[in-house]
Amino acid sequence: MTMLLDGGPQFPGLGVGSFGAPRHHEMPNREPAGMGLNPFGDSTHAAAAAAAAAAFKLSPAAAHDLSSGQSSAFTPQGSGYANALGHHHHHHHHHHHTSQVPSYGGAASAAFNSTREFLFRQRSSGLSEAASGGGQHGLFAGSASSLHAPAGIPEPPSYLLFPGLHEQGAGHPSPTGHVDNNQVHLGLRGELFGRADPYRPVASPRTDPYAAGAQFPNYSPMNMNMGVNVAAHHGPGAFFRYMRQPIKQELSCKWIDEAQLSRPKKSCDRTFSTMHELVTHVTMEHVGGPEQNNHVCYWEECPREGKSFKAKYKLVNHIRVHTGEKPFPCPFPGCGKIFARSENLKIHKRTHTGEKPFKCEFEGCDRRFANSSDRKKHMHVHTSDKPYICKVCDKSYTHPSSLRKHMKVHESQGSDSSPAASSGYESSTPPAIASANSKDTTKTPSAVQTSTSHNPGLPPNFNEWYV
């Protein structure tokens, strides 16, 4: 990490005196001052810092001295800190094993060849505090406070880059700074300030994606101002303003009170935010209690048109058609189906269990069914009853599904003059006969019927009488 300090007598406690006149060196690895060397875009201070800068870099082994309590004013962050935060600029780290700065040129080259992370900027306002001594955590306290916002904006303690270092130095505050909100602010003229955060952190329902830093107990992940786990100090941010908010569902009661004298009669039109509130309202205020004898649905545009039910529970089940209430979900995982009546749920669960309790009562038939209605439809096969009659051609069928298939033939005839062209509909005519009709259109209908009855290779059309 690069730390550019103002060369001058303002750091006597750090053991650094004044430097000589600045020398101009060729620095090919550095961008111009206006290209991001100074995060504040101040070319004057950037030029001064670039001209009279000093870099301090110790042995990489000193990166681990912080945990053992050894005092060090400047600790290299190239080995421990960069590896903890996932930096891969290994080609920039040149290990200069020196305990002091031998010359300005060597220090400047070491500074400009290392990673650019921290820039010390001369504060124009100036602070009255002077650096009288160098504590172990004095510099890192100033570095850690670099992510706080400018004056007048509250700064959460979660912005600390090195919370472990502050915990270690809590009992030994730096004599060169002051403590504010558990943060030790360095009282130097070159105290580091980060770029002001223009975005407020927002709440996130997910866990911390930077949990990889847990393996480094003394370091916390960088970019803590990205809005993860710091939302406890701020309200919802600007990011959620652009997220699509869920549309508030309003359920309206369309029950018409028959006691109204006005014409036309108006519906209730009370709105509710949940289905439970709507159902409770209809049951308590419109359907009535056990004393109610008239079980009639007065919902707007109800197709029953005032026809009464024999029992109250039947009226309640019917009202679910209007309200859309389905209080009986399938308990089997992954199914997700819901039903308005418990009887339908009971029948549906047999599709999961494979239970078929209804056996065909005809002797010699082993067919079983999941519900009694399917068994009743099947019984027409044995009795030769055909209660399902076509209203167009008076044909009758033993099963309603056969009648539905037959009705598609009439639908195809309405769209196409040829019955063979089914237009995607399934007809009751066998495919072989349909293909014969399409190939030979000169045959009369009687000839087709004769060929059908005398063709031993064609099976009978079982779809007409059995499903």
Swiss-Prot record:
<dbReference type="GO" id="GO:0071907">
    <property type="term" value="P:determination of digestive tract left/right asymmetry"/>
</dbReference>
<dbReference type="GO" id="GO:0007368">
    <property type="term" value="P:determination of left/right symmetry"/>
</dbReference>
<keyword id="KW-0805">Transcription regulation</keyword>
<dbReference type="GO" id="GO:0000978">
    <property type="term" value="F:RNA polymerase II cis-regulatory region sequence-specific DNA binding"/>
</dbReference>
<dbReference type="GO" id="GO:0030324">
    <property type="term" value="P:lung development"/>
</dbReference>
<keyword id="KW-0863">Zinc-finger</keyword>
<dbReference type="GO" id="GO:0035108">
    <property type="term" value="P:limb morphogenesis"/>
</dbReference>
<dbReference type="GO" id="GO:0042473">
    <property type="term" value="P:outer ear morphogenesis"/>
</dbReference>
<dbReference type="GO" id="GO:0045893">
    <property type="term" value="P:positive regulation of DNA-templated transcription"/>
</dbReference>
<dbReference type="GO" id="GO:0035545">
    <property type="term" value="P:determination of left/right asymmetry in nervous system"/>
</dbReference>
<feature type="zinc finger region" description="C2H2-type 5">
    <location>
        <begin position="388"/>
        <end position="410"/>
    </location>
</feature>
<feature type="region of interest" description="Disordered">
    <location>
        <begin position="404"/>
        <end position="467"/>
    </location>
</feature>
<feature type="region of interest" description="Disordered">
    <location>
        <begin position="66"/>
        <end position="107"/>
    </location>
</feature>
<keyword id="KW-0832">Ubl conjugation</keyword>
<dbReference type="GO" id="GO:0001228">
    <property type="term" value="F:DNA-binding transcription activator activity, RNA polymerase II-specific"/>
</dbReference>
<dbReference type="GO" id="GO:0048318">
    <property type="term" value="P:axial mesoderm development"/>
</dbReference>
<dbReference type="GO" id="GO:0045944">
    <property type="term" value="P:positive regulation of transcription by RNA polymerase II"/>
</dbReference>
<feature type="zinc finger region" description="C2H2-type 4">
    <location>
        <begin position="358"/>
        <end position="382"/>
    </location>
</feature>
<dbReference type="InterPro" id="IPR041643">
    <property type="entry name" value="Znf_ZIC"/>
</dbReference>
<dbReference type="GO" id="GO:0009880">
    <property type="term" value="P:embryonic pattern specification"/>
</dbReference>
<dbReference type="GO" id="GO:0070986">
    <property type="term" value="P:left/right axis specification"/>
</dbReference>
<keyword id="KW-0225">Disease variant</keyword>
<dbReference type="Pfam" id="PF18366">
    <property type="entry name" value="zf_ZIC"/>
</dbReference>
<feature type="short sequence motif" description="Nuclear localization signal">
    <location>
        <begin position="330"/>
        <end position="352"/>
    </location>
</feature>
<dbReference type="GO" id="GO:1904888">
    <property type="term" value="P:cranial skeletal system development"/>
</dbReference>
<dbReference type="GO" id="GO:0005634">
    <property type="term" value="C:nucleus"/>
</dbReference>
<dbReference type="GO" id="GO:0035469">
    <property type="term" value="P:determination of pancreatic left/right asymmetry"/>
</dbReference>
<dbReference type="InterPro" id="IPR043359">
    <property type="entry name" value="GLI-like"/>
</dbReference>
<dbReference type="GO" id="GO:0090009">
    <property type="term" value="P:primitive streak formation"/>
</dbReference>
<keyword id="KW-0221">Differentiation</keyword>
<dbReference type="GO" id="GO:0005737">
    <property type="term" value="C:cytoplasm"/>
</dbReference>
<keyword id="KW-0010">Activator</keyword>
<dbReference type="GO" id="GO:1990837">
    <property type="term" value="F:sequence-specific double-stranded DNA binding"/>
</dbReference>
<dbReference type="GO" id="GO:0003700">
    <property type="term" value="F:DNA-binding transcription factor activity"/>
</dbReference>
<dbReference type="GO" id="GO:0035283">
    <property type="term" value="P:central nervous system segmentation"/>
</dbReference>
<dbReference type="GO" id="GO:0071910">
    <property type="term" value="P:determination of liver left/right asymmetry"/>
</dbReference>
<dbReference type="GO" id="GO:0030182">
    <property type="term" value="P:neuron differentiation"/>
</dbReference>
<keyword id="KW-0524">Neurogenesis</keyword>
<dbReference type="GO" id="GO:0003228">
    <property type="term" value="P:atrial cardiac muscle tissue development"/>
</dbReference>
<feature type="zinc finger region" description="C2H2-type 3">
    <location>
        <begin position="328"/>
        <end position="352"/>
    </location>
</feature>
<feature type="compositionally biased region" description="Low complexity">
    <location>
        <begin position="412"/>
        <end position="428"/>
    </location>
</feature>
<keyword id="KW-0677">Repeat</keyword>
